Design a protein with these regions (language model features):
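Active-site groove signature of glycoside hydrolases
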Residues: 88-109, 134-144
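Acidic/histidine-rich catalytic cores of soluble enzymes
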Residues: 21, 30-31, 121-225, 276
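N-terminal pre-domain/capping segments
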Residues: 1-94, 109, 116, 120, ...
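A short, acidic, amphipathic alpha-helical segment used as a generic capping/interface helix at domain edges
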Residues: 224-237
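Surface-exposed, active-site-proximal loop segments in enzymatic domains
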Residues: 64-80, 100-114, 212-219, 254-258
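Active-site clefts of carbohydrate-active enzymes
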Residues: 205-210, 217-219, 241-255
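Short beta-strand segments at enzyme active-site cores
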Residues: 33, 60-61, 94-100, 132-137, ...
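Active-site beta-loop-alpha junctions enriched in small/polar residues
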Residues: 8-10, 34-38, 63-66, 101-103, ...
Length: 278
């Protein structure tokens, strides 16, 4: 498996080149960032050269379209999706991800119908660039009632929804935090096939009852109570060999420097991967 970073949890990084250098110096394999913005700043050849210089891959981009709101906003975002997909492909990226909130103010059946069609269109656009779409189920209990109506928050419901979307390039963004807050087990992971997983996020949780864990209160791998060695061992067992990327959402910005935080990430990754026998 390939060890990756997002900017989330790494403090006040000044620019993408600093992010790439920090990740490379700490021995990571990939970063997730905005491919279109990088190309706009450095040019296509300059952006490619940056990844080559730092011996990194672009793991995933975020889905840059508002698929949860009204139809006008969705349609207006389609050109940006095409541009983002083209930029990602130029940098060798084959993954694009979005999250699915576990509740909604819209009537859930109608929202499901709209979202299914919209995400199918997104998958078709991405597929033209040979990019996969990862859907992230979101587990923390407090978000299940943050809006009026319950929606989807389990892995199985998300897999069923992926089947309904019906495009071969759609799969899971599997986040260890949401695996934990759904009280899922290693056995649940071992039932997956590697092709069902588009991307993986790694982080840890404070020692709290599962129904009290907040989405934006995450900690670094190896510093909490999630069975990350079991999580990683199960992924390895089913044959998943792709990106495992840190994402640390916190209620306030870290006070440590980006250099210190990346080293903290490196230490945490080494700890949990070693404990998983990897």
């Amino acid at each position: 498996m390939l060890k990756g970073l997002t900017r989330a949890g790494l403090g006040a990084i000044e620019n993408d080149e600093q992010f790439l250098k920090l990740a490379s110096d700490a021995g990571f394999d990939s970063v997730d960032l905005n491919a279109k913005a990088l190309i706009e700043q450095y040019g296509q050849e300059g952006a490619i050269e940056l990844f080559q210089r730092y011996n990194l891959q672009l793991g995933s981009i975020d889905l840059p379209i508002e698929w949860r709101a009204d139809e006008e906003a969705f349609l207006a975002g389609l050109p940006a999706l095409t541009e983002a997909a083209a930029a990602a492909r130029k940098l060798g990226c084959t993954r694009c991800c979005t999250y699915v909130l576990p509740s909604t103010d819209q009537m859930p059946a109608h929202f499901m119908a709209l979202a299914t069609r919209r995400l199918r269109i997104c998958a078709q656009v991405l597929g033209a660039y040979r990019i996969r779409l990862g859907l992230e189920f979101v587990g923390p209990h407090h978000l299940r009632t943050a809006w009026k109506h319950p929606f989807i928050w389990t892995m199985q419901d998300t897999l069923d929804w992926i089947d309904a979307i019906g495009e071969p390039n759609v799969g899971l963004l599997l986040d260890a935090y949401h695996w934990h807050t759904n009280s899922l087990t290693v056995t649940d992971l071992e039932r997956l096939q590697p092709h069902q997983i588009v991307h993986v996020h790694l982080n840890d949780a404070k020692d709290l009852p599962v129904d009290q864990i907040l989405d934006n209160d995450r900690i670094y791998p190896g510093e909490g109570i999630i069975d990350l060695p079991g999580f990683l061992h199960a992924l390895n067992k089913i044959g998943y060999t792709d990106f495992v990327t840190q994402e640390i959402l916190t209620p306030s910005a870290p006070t440590e420097s980006p250099e210190e935080l990346v080293q903290r990430s490196k230490k945490g990754y080494a700890q949990v991967f070693s404990a998983a026998g990897l």
